[in-house]
Every structure is written in C-alpha cells, then in structure tokens.
Regions:
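N-terminal/domain-start alpha-helical segments
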Residues: 1-97
Length: 97
C-alpha cells in the first residue's frame, strides 16, 4: 500500500511517516499542497492523509481536486479542529474519515 502524508507540521509529518513506514507501508511526505500535487502527477496512492489547513491551500479544496481526478483514492483528514462542521464537510467531499 502506498500512502501520501500531506501535513505542514514537520514533527507530526515525520512521526506519521515513521510509524507508517515501520508498519510496512510505502510512504511519501509533503509539507505543502504544491508538493503533494507534484507527487500526484507522478504516482497513484491508495491512501492520502490530508491536513485541513495547509500553508498554500485549503485541504477541503485539495480533496475535491483529488476526488475529481481519482475518485477511488481513500482520503483521511487530519486536523486539530474539533468542529463537527469540518467533519461533515470532509465526508461530503468523499473523505473516509
């Protein structure tokens, strides 16, 4: 399984990637939407772990873009926000969690 982690907090990004690699997954890491976009032009991913707030874009908008090109890609949002409206918006955009 190939996973893309898109999280701008470097420590959290590194921790997620380390744990996923240790569990046997192939993982690519992006700190920004633009870097993640470049990965997506070269590689298909089984799972994308996506931050809602990125320095160069909105995770919800990016999710919409990804789902338009690759509707079968599983997306899990990662955020410190605990607002139910954010959770519902993610589900409406096709995120799994």
């Amino acid at each position: 399984m190939r996973i893309l982690v898109v999280e701008d907090d470097r420590l959290l990004n590194n921790t997620l990637c380390y744990n996923l690699n240790t569990a046997g997954y192939t993982v690519d890491s992006a700190l920004t939407k633009s870097v993640a976009s470049s990965f997506l032009t070269k590689q298909d991913y089984d799972l994308i772990v996506l931050d809602v707030n990125l320095p160069d874009g909105n995770g919800f908008d990016f999710c919409r873009e990804i789902k338009e090109r690759r509707p079968d890609t599983v997306i899990i949002f990662l955020t410190a926000n605990d607002m139910e409206s954010d959770m519902l918006k993610g589900y409406e955009l096709g995120a799994e969690d």
